[in-house]
Amino acid sequence: MFRPTFNKGSDPKRGQRGFSVIEMAVVLLIIAIVAAFVVPQIMSYMRMYRLGVGGRNVATALQRARYLATSNNTLAGVFVAELQRVDIEQYDPMGKTPPQNMGVVQLPDGVTVASDAPKQIAFDGRGVITPTPKESPTIRLNGIDGYYLFVTVSPTGQVTVSEATRDDRT
């Protein structure tokens, strides 16, 4: 009554089940070819992403230093201590005590501050750069494979981050 019935016409013969080795090899070859094109693009995107994160972190450090200066009506700024580290410092207006470290920004792996970037940018109690520069200070961040971006501070304290671009000369 409930016995399954087999149709002899649809019964696969021995050796005709599953995929052949050639079919599997073709599929693996297609996957390898696609991966050869996609993986470098993903790696390039990740490098640009890390550079963008570093730029936003430096911009945040500058904005925090400006906030410290305006909220405490004192001097505060950022100091590029190393190629991959930016310190946020608050200064004694009288100059009697050393600067207080108010925070540290560690840049992601592979992201460094350019050697020609300003080593220190300070804000006064009004939130403007002191001493007043002739032009807006610009910090260049370098990434891997020639990618770079700029963090620019206007004399009034406005911070902007450029898009990551690639230097084709490298």
What positions do the PLM features span?
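Acidic/polar helix N-cap motif
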Residues: 13-15
